[in-house]
């Protein structure tokens, strides 16, 4: 699978731009603020139906304009496909495949397997548990549409249950029968999501460990630890036990929406005890493991986006990535960098075909 062409209209800082891509390596070089990352983000947008860097869709429209369009042609399974994502102010975003609009964006997730490695990934370490849950969910959802559906349904029920708890508080009333209906639904969806997260991590963690060892070449011990209330008790029991707490807080305090994926080094939080270099290695290993997991499960090499990562890597880690490109581990690769000479030297050393776009 690879992208052939990309056209942008009023997307972020681009009024209009078009690119014809190499099937292997494509580099976007230029000064900071010129739009290199925005091209990568447009490609991400096509895969996930949203920006990696700005979740507020309307803010991706070029300042002073009324709409944006991202239009791409790609080859997948020997077929040419057209994907178009567009948004007009005041209207819903539209995502089309070969001219036909998706009824639900979730039906598109997984059609373009894609992994991004970016300085923004540091949020996975420094931000709260929601960021790490989203990482888990995005990987699983690209391969399992049932999981994504269950996740969406679970989140809807959480919103409804929380609204009911607020209603009880405002009206000084309580109806356990109605609450029990939501509890049963959460238990049904939550149990399945919990089991699938466990299954995913059982396979993912060994892949992560291999990549971390390859990148660092060191003996330091790193861990991904899944934390969930459901290891202790089933969700129905937890919801019943915490009812007084939930009524006081006006929201649901236990469930898979509180899960976390703890990042550790030598059994301590890497956020506090890992150096910058150790944190970078951890995140790159995490994303390369995501790439390998998706490739293994789908049989398709995901598109890989490297956003400004050479600034953050020493020569040893760059050499490791070059080695992986040469081994045909990767499929199509998109790179952004501020240093044209460095970029060209790196891609030349891979002995693969490439294009460099000076923005």
From Swiss-Prot:
Keyword Metal-binding part of the UniProt annotation: no
GO cellular component: cytoplasm
Keyword presence, Ribosomal protein: no
UniProt xrefs under Gene3D superfamilies: P-loop containing nucleotide triphosphate hydrolases (3.40.50.300), RecF/RecN/SMC, N-terminal domain (1.20.1050.90)
Swiss-Prot/TrEMBL GO biological process terms: DNA replication; DNA synthesis involved in DNA repair; double-strand break repair; SOS response
Major location category of this protein: cytoplasm
Function per UniProt: The RecF protein is involved in DNA metabolism; it is required for DNA replication and normal SOS inducibility. RecF binds preferentially to single-stranded, linear DNA. It also seems to bind ATP.
Designated name of the protein: DNA replication and repair protein RecF
Highest classification ranks of the organism: Bacteria, Pseudomonadati, Bacteroidota, Flavobacteriia, Flavobacteriales
Gene this chain is encoded by: recF
């Amino acid at each position: 699978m690879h992208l052939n062409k990309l056209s942008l209209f009023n997307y972020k800082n681009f009024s209009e731009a078009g690119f014809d891509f190499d099937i292997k390596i494509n580099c976007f070089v230029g000064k900071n603020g010129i739009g290199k990352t925005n091209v990568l983000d447009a490609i991400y947008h096509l895969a996930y139906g949203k920006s990696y860097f700005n979740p507020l869709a309307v803010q991706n429209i070029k300042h002073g304009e009324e709409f944006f369009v991202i239009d791409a042609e790609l080859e997948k399974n020997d077929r040419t496909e057209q994907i178009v994502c567009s948004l007009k102010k005041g209207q819903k975003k539209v995502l089309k495949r070969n001219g036909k609009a998706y009824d639900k964006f979730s039906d598109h997730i997984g059609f373009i397997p894609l992994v991004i490695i970016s300085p923004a990934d540091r949020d996975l370490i420094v931000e709260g548990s929601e960021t790490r849950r989203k990482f888990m969910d995005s990987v699983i959802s690209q391969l399992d549409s049932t999981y994504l559906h269950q996740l969406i349904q679970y989140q809807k029920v959480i919103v409804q249950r929380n609204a009911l708890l607020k209603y009880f508080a405002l009206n000084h009333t309580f109806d356990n029968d109605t609450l029990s209906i939501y509890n049963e639904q959460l238990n049904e969806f939550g149990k399945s999501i919990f089991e699938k997260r466990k299954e995913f991590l059982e396979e993912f963690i060994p892949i992560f460990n291999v990549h971390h060892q390859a990148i660092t070449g060191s003996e330091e011990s790193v861990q991904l630890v899944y934390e969930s209330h459901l290891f202790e008790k089933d969700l129905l029991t937890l919801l019943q036990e915490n009812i007084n707490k939930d009524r006081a807080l006006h929201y649901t305090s236990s469930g898979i929406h509180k899960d976390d994926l703890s990042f550790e080094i030598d059994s301590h939080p890497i956020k506090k005890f890992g150096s910058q270099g150790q944190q970078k290695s951890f995140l790159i290993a995490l994303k390369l493991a995501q790439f390998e997991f998706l490739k293994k499960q789908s049989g398709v090499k995901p598109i890989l986006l490297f956003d400004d990562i050479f600034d953050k890597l020493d020569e040893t880690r760059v050499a490791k990535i070059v080695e992986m490109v040469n081994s045909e581990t990767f499929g199509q690769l998109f790179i952004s960098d501020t240093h044209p000479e460095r970029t060209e030297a790196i891609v030349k050393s891979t002995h693969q075909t490439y294009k460099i776009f000076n923005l």
